[in-house]
Structure formats: structure tokens, C-alpha cells
């Protein structure tokens, strides 16, 4: 029995309960976008207007696109990806004037408007800045699916000044950006929605990307790009802790674009930080407010780049054929890396100093570029936040990937016989993309996530475990770590009756044991008792807070912390410089209940400097803390070492994480603790002991009747539990040594 099949549970998708596992929390990692602590920001519709106003200035202080309200409807029992109408600020009516003309309305920005508009586009509508200098927008009623209408609509009618620093001559053509204010008032130059690939539509759906075609004239890259087609989280309604991760630009297959933000004055040969968003390979977009690049670029004098890549079946469907080769989303990222290599010097960046950084599935993506021979030479360093290629949710086998693709084909009425793969692909290409993403979960069995990376023989030649064991990966510096409560967010989504989204939630001992039973229905008694034994606080086994927190640790250790540790350990064993952190700060304005602690993704807004935005209510200490995090991250990108040239109380020394010392730095508001691990014993349990136990007890009967591990003297005479204890002690000693 494989370990990934141990912990099973139920997942709530909208109103539908789907069987799911704890070790199969895998599914949740991929349904839900990564999450972080920010304050939700929603704009209300103004007189039904379809234009969303958004100021890239200190006054508005939001990200690359407005955080507009989105809604979805349930289709076939899953969350719909159809966005709702757009939103605008309450003052937009005084800034805009419009005149309707059949299909096109010309909307002109008033000369006295102190705003940069990055429009939200409602379903069936699109808005584009035609000329940044004139401040003119074009509102196009574009039919059922919001999409870019091609490059010509974004070309300027006037010749560009060759001396204009906002006009950059890329290898595909000239582009024009715009200068905006960072939250601190510093200026940055921004280019949004630079095409790096041809739209992957029609016959290009599911295939590896093709480089963008050249264009003539000047392309106005001043509008945030489309988000790739995906489902939208509606489980908690308009709760900002969840909706902050929903896409805030139109959903479209035409989504392969890059964003670049550079400090002003423009640097020469600056370090480049390329962000890869998370979302479980199922969702996500580079334009979220929490990823606002302006503070990081302006405060640390680095070039910040982000990219859109295909997710869900459109990005990771695999049939092993030229038409559906798999890993299209990873090849999107690879093509974007090549674009950065060939063009970033034109923006003031140094192509030899590119650092990839990402969180959750973004961190897994970064790690796969470290492993892939196709990507290793395209960047220098890597930062991995709460993600590792050895996570149980990171990859599936070729056989399983093919089975899931055929299940999807069957669900949408396409040929699904293994002998008719070409027919299946041809049919799937003709389906509406929203139909595909809305039917992916209906094709699955228990505890499975539909479309993730696969060992395809092209991007990946072997499993990450084999690459790490053999030393076949990029030898370089890495910075990596995890947060103290990695599991709570996912547990809240599938144990909704037990862990309600409110203050004061506790878990009794009986509820804890019941939760473990629900999460582990298919394992034998020894394995289940081992998990209960390991995650019980035996000094206070009936403590309701400890029992609640133990559930978080079970999920977080298995899916995140222990895999991050494993990756760091293997890198350190090869003599690479490794820096590890444990993130411990919970923001004052966190919308989630306090008992959720420091959840998966809570570090992201501090990495991007969101607390520096004066409109968001962060404390002065949190602003200073964000400056410290940005400095650590950017120092690493510049030099391979997060430490400043001279140590100080403000920047405590961050020790290397060596194979023997295993040191990490605790990143908290007022702490500078250096620890060892983290969570060495628990990771020995998952990585060393439990696999041995499962192998040793595989012939034992199924799940034993639920009970406390030590509730009677009979415990000491059970052979399976004697094996359990001996194996646990042996594995723990070996792991720590």
C-alpha cells in the first residue's frame, strides 16, 4: 500500500460532498488557490458600468489588476468559472465619459484624473487602453467569451519616440509601458501583458506553446493580461480570505503573457526576480493584488517579472501523443524563461542573474525547473516557498494521467477508448474550455486530483525522487521554507462541520479520533494507531485546542513541511548553499479565525511589500518586517546569500542549512530564533517510519475498531503495535543521526 493512499476524507465542492483523503488533501491543494493574509478589497458596481477602475498609485495601492468581485454558479456539482460583471470605484463616473456606438464605445480618461485604469472585464466584454499617452480606452462588446482581440487593437496610431524610455524594442516588436507610483511614492515603470507565446487555441490547445509572432508598430502593454481558464472558489461566498485568490482579470485561453516592473531610474544589469504563482496547477493568476510587484521592485532595486501559464486540463492534460503531450503549463513557463533570457536586458535586467521564486504549486514549478535539463541553464537561483517536487500532490504517473484524460473525455461526451486517443483529443479541442474545467472533478475517483505534471520524457525524464537521489539537478543556491500552520486552510474546506470558519472552535478527543478515522478509512489498524499516537499530546490528550491543532499538523507535515525539508536536505548533501526559514508571523488584519495561526501562503504579502501600502492598515512593525523580508529575498537574488554585508540586530545572521546542522531561521515579527529542523521527529515519522510500518503490516486485517492507542493493557500485547513502536524508535534514531 502506498502512503499517499492512507488518509482519506470528504471535500466540499460548493454544495457537493466529494470523498477525499488527508494524504489526499492533495485534491484540495489543487482545487484551491494558494492563500495568504491580506485584507480583501472589493469594488462595487457603479451604475452597472462594465469598467473597473484601479489606481496603480499610493492612494489606491492595489496590485496589477483590480480585485473585482467575481461569482460563479454550480455546474454539474462543481464551481463555475464564469465571472460576474465587473466593478468600478465609486468615483469613476466623474473621471470617465463615454458615448455608445453600436459595438464600440470610446471612453476617455479625464485629464485631471489622478488614476491609472487597469480595467476589469466582465463576461462578454473587454476594455483596452489604446494609447497610454492619450489616456483613451476602447470598450468592445466581444460576445460570449472575453478574450483579447489580437495585437492590432493594442497598437498605437502614432509613431513612438525612439528616446522614450517606456518604449522597449523586444525581439518580437516594440512595446510601450507606463510609469506609476509604488506605495511609498517611488516611481516604477510597468509593462503588463507582453505576449510571449501564440494564443493556445484551436489546434494549439493542449500542445506545447509556440513563440509569439512578431508585430509592427508599438504594442501598448499597459493592461493586465487575461487569466487562464479555471474554476472560481465560491465555497465561502464573498469571504475575503478566500476570494482574494480568485482571478481578477477575464478568463480566457488567450492568456500567455508576461509582466515586467522596473524601478526608476532604470537600473543597468539589475538582478531579476521571476515569480511563478501557485494554485495547485488548478488555478491562479499573476495579476492578484497580493502579488503587486511595485514595492519589491522600487524598494530593492530589482526587476520583478511574472508570467501567466495554463492550468487545469488545458495546461496539464496528458495522453502521450503529439496533440496532448502533457506538461503544457510547464512548457509555458519554460518559454517565458527563454523570453526573459532574450529580452530582460532591454529593461535593465541582467539575464545571468535571474532568480525564480514561487509558492505552493509555484514552488513545485520552480523545483521542476531545477530538475529539468530544458530549464536549468535559463536562471541562476531559486526560492521555494511551501512547495517541493516530492510532495504527494506534485505529480502523477503517465498511466494515471492518461486514465484521467479519458475520464474527462467521457464526461464531456467525447471518444474515450484507449485505442482512439486522436479522436479524443480532436473532440476535446472543440469543447468550450469552461465545460472542460467544470467537468474535471466529475471524472475522478476518491482522493485524486485531475491534472498535474507528469514524467513525460520531455520536460521530466524521471521522477523527482530519482533525480534527487542521483544528483541530477541544477547545482545552485536555494532559499526555502514553510509556515507554522500549513494544513488548516485545506482542512477548513473539507471538515467544514468540525472546523467552522469562526472563532472559538475546538476539537474534543472523540472528535479528534473520529476525524482521524474519517481521514484514514482504508488503512489497517497499525497505521491508523501510529498516526493517532504520533499526533497526540500525551501530556494533555483531552486538550481540545491540542486535538484541533494536531489535525493541522498532520496535513501540513505530510504535504508541505516534510517535503520542503527533504528537498533542502538533499540539496545540502550535494554541497549547495541552502537557506531555510520557518515563517511564524500572523498579520493583525488576518480575516481568518485566530486559531488558524500562520497559514499556507501568509508570507506572500510580506515578500511583495503589501504592508507598505498606507491604505491597508498594517502596523509600523509589520511594515518594518516586510522591509526585512524583501531585503532577505532580494539579497539572495543578488548574491546567493540573504544576509546583508554586515550583520545587525535588524537583520540577524541567517545560517546555512547544512546536511548535518539543518539550521533554519524563524521569520517572525520580533524573533530571530535559529532552530534545527524544523519538525525532525514528525518528518522521520512520515518519511522513514510509516512506510516501514505499512510494509511490515500489509498482511494484517483492515481497520481495527476505533479506540485510544493506550486505552487498555491489551495494547502492550498486540504484535502490530509492538512492530509500530520498535520501528518508530529505530527510524527516528536513524533519521536524526
UniProtKB/Swiss-Prot annotation:
Its main location: other. It is an enzyme of class 3 (hydrolase). The keyword Hydrolase applies. Residues 1-38 form the signal peptide. GO terms for biological process: acetylcholine catabolic process; choline metabolic process. Keywords: Disulfide bond, Glycoprotein, Hydrolase, Neurotransmitter degradation, Serine esterase, Signal, Synapse. Glycans are attached at residues 220, 670. It is found in: Synapse. Disulfide bonds join 228-255, 414-427, 562-683. Coiled coil: none annotated. Its EC number is 3.1.1.7. GO terms for molecular function: acetylcholinesterase activity. It catalyses: acetylcholine + H2O = choline + acetate + H(+). InterPro entries: AB_hydrolase_fold, AChE-related_enzymes, CarbesteraseB, Carboxylesterase_B_AS, Carboxylesterase_B_CS, Cholinesterase. The active site is at residues 360, 486, 600. GO terms for cellular component: extracellular space; plasma membrane; synapse. Residues 141-168 are annotated as: Disordered. Rapidly hydrolyzes choline released into the synapse. Belongs to the type-B carboxylesterase/lipase family. This is Acetylcholinesterase.
